[in-house]
C-alpha cells in the first residue's frame, strides 16, 4: 500500500534505483570472487 501512495514518481526513481542496485550487486559479486580465490 505504501508503494502505491508513492506511485507518482515511481517510474523515474525505480529505474535509477534499479541501476544502482545492479551496480552494487556487481561490486558484491566481485568481492565474493576475490574471497573465493583466497579461500
UniProtKB/Swiss-Prot annotation:
Primary residence: cytoplasm
Spans annotated as Disordered: 1-39
Gene Ontology annotations for the cellular component aspect, listed alphabetically: cytoplasm
Domain of life: Eukaryota
This protein's UniProt keywords: Cytoplasm
This protein's record includes keyword Cytoplasm: yes
Cellular localisation: Cytoplasm
Subunit details: Oligomer.
Family, per entry: To human SET/PHAPII protein.
Function noted in UniProt: Has a role in the physiological regulation of fucosylation processes.
Protein name: Fuctinin-3
The species this protein was found in: Rattus norvegicus (Rat)
Amino acid at each position: 500500500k505504501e508503494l502505491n501512495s508513492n506511485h507518482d514518481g515511481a517510474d523515474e526513481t525505480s529505474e535509477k534505483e534499479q541501476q544502482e542496485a545492479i551496480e552494487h550487486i556487481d561490486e558484491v559479486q566481485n568481492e565474493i570472487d576475490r574471497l573465493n580465490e583466497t579461500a
